[in-house]
């Protein structure tokens, strides 16, 4: 990833952080009613609109 602007790198980092799974404590607290979140993005299937 050469010649990336700092803003673009920052947005990619944010998208990377947002793509994490639901925390274990949330799954335990809700008695497994919440096990996944709908905004999860797969690296191959979902496209990322980062400018």
From Swiss-Prot:
Composition bias, Basic residues: 1-19
Keyword annotations of the record: Ribonucleoprotein, Ribosomal protein
GO term, biological process aspect, one: translation
Pfam family, one: Ribosomal_L39
Keyword Transmembrane helix (UniProt): no
Endpoints of the signal sequence: none
Gene3D superfamilies given in the database record: Ribosomal protein L39e (1.10.1620.10)
GO CC annotation terms, alphabetical: ribonucleoprotein complex; ribosome
Domain of life: Archaea
Membrane-spanning parts: none
Molecular function GO labels: structural constituent of ribosome
Annotated spans, Disordered: 1-23
HAMAP family the UniProt entry points to: Ribosomal_eL39
UniProt family annotation: Belongs to the eukaryotic ribosomal protein eL39 family.
Protein name, as recorded: Large ribosomal subunit protein eL39
Organism: Methanosarcina mazei (strain ATCC BAA-159 / DSM 3647 / Goe1 / Go1 / JCM 11833 / OCM 88)
Lineage: Archaea, Methanobacteriati, Methanobacteriota, Stenosarchaea group, Methanomicrobia
